[in-house]
């Protein structure tokens, strides 16, 4: 529900990073994003919206996606960036940090925003000065909750969630429920005790993101969102806002093959080494 306030319309910047992304998936992403922006404009919440699309596979595959983002109604400025190499997730997003925006949306191309998602998220950030980032309520395409907000993990949580078979995860279901904040995630009220936010959809105050320098360049893939969350919480809160809804058609590194498992493990070790090991 939009608050009754007289805030000046804001500038929203948005970035998404592609890597051999499915065409139909990107088209759905685009259409949902444009509808959510339309809702913002209909309520006169934004004065300007910019979108930057970074195609990390352009150096390998050529230009396969730029045509999807031409003539977008509601977008004031569009940049389609094709790096000469695959920069990884965080570094690619950091190419677009120098924005003069009020709020910045980091969004995966496999995330589909609800029509009122941006209205809800921006309204929350404007009315909560102590909050630097909001994270949404997410489900998969079958409507199953994804628990995108988390508490700081232990190594055991990390191993169970990333690599354990279903029968073993079931044995530790209570433990994983605490890590995934089921108690807060299934409530109807916003929660400001989030310690880790998923990088698939992050809505932040731009000045704070710039102060942090964006994502750490030390993570090529995975855990850059964990690292950013920990650093951000030194300055502001992260809020889970259940009325800000998305569908996320992705994740599950352990199901994507050995290269992804190695990247996941490498980044996990870096994260714990940098921010503290909690074993159990």
Where are these regions (language model features)?
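Conserved donor NDP-sugar-binding/catalytic core segment of glycosyltransferases
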Residues: 114-148
